[in-house]
From Swiss-Prot:
The gene is mmoY. This is Methane monooxygenase component A beta chain. M.trichosporium has two forms of methane monooxygenase, a soluble and a membrane-bound type. The soluble type consists of four components (A to D): protein A, comprising three chains, in an alpha-2, beta-2, gamma-2 configuration, is a nonheme iron protein containing an unusual mu-hydroxo bridge structure at its active site and interacts with both oxygen and methane. Signal peptide: none annotated. InterPro entries: Ferritin-like_SF (IPR009078), MethMoxA_beta (IPR054956), MP_mOase_hydro (IPR012078), Phenol_Hydrox (IPR003430), RNR-like (IPR012348). It comes from Methylosinus trichosporium.
Amino acid sequence: MSQPQSSQVTKRGLTDPERAAIIAAAVPDHALDTQRKYHYFIQPRWKPLSEYEQLSCYAQPNPDWIAGGLDWGDWTQKFHGGRPSWGNESTELRTTDWYRHRDPARRWHHPYVKDKSEEARYTQRFLAAYSSEGSIRTIDPYWRDEILNKYFGALLYSEYGLFNAHSSVGRDCLSDTIRQTAVFAALDKVDNAQMIQMERLFIAKLVPGFDASTDVPKKIWTTDPIYSGARATVQEIWQGVQDWNEILWAGHAVMIATFGQFARREFFQRLATVYGDTLTPFFTAQSQTYFQTTRGAIDDLFVYCLANDSEFGAHNRTFLNAWTEHYLASSVAALKDFVGLYAKVEKSRADRSRRRLRGAAASSAIGRSITPDKIGFRVDVDQKVDAVLAGYKN
């Protein structure tokens, strides 16, 4: 049988009228918490606070010794050798707040999946109409079998390699908004690779004997001099770099902005219609949309947040300039190899004049893509274009 509580035990509890009165008297007569918004700790980029920011910011553990973090303490688990789950030593760049970055497109999981679903539906409608119209008959067989199937097919390995380069970025980056930008950019790259193979498989269904296997494109990517420089650059970014900021900058601000844009837009997309190919531009247009979306996010991260950081801006621009110098040289070498592909297309159809190529290389591949004024980088465009055109063969 339970024993009744003593008066001493009872007086220790909050039910004791005397103690309750003391507590009530000590409570201020004004509101204890004047901040009634749940996300008061998020600094909004836009007004009001966007859904993207509410669902993205500070989801990742954020100790205060990582700039911008709001928590405290150390990690309960670490990698072998003592490396922390996340740490400032993962990059050479510095900032007063890693959580300042915002994707201008405000992409998070739901709108990203929604956009991809819409793309899949209109792609299905386009391919059904293309097949029904018999539009495949307008493609020049040489372009279809030799250039499109083999060399455009080989480009998927460049896209896939750059996709894989993001794997460590998605793990090591120091804020959740940067992680979303990196992961969505990575998924767009693998989407590009899949679209190239989708086009080849689609053609194989319409053209008897068309080989849609990846054996020949893989051999071209790994052995053909056309892709020698591109392959070396992609391999370096993917396997030779530890700094996650360097991977993002080298890949998106330099390699993709130069070699990727020239190969995809200036060669395959521009020449496709000359050879009666209206199929390839449909897919490359989607890739160009991905490029522009990611470009806005990369610009926000590296220019707005890092190059213009109030305390570490000069430090960061030093590294961005060094990285640009290094990877621009590699990308120019890749372009020099790639323009040799013009020797495989007919002069009368390719508009292969040296002036035409010089303009394409200067304006779209080097001049506008690097945006040197934003980080203080200086480049001799004419010298770089001359280096590219050294690989041009009449």
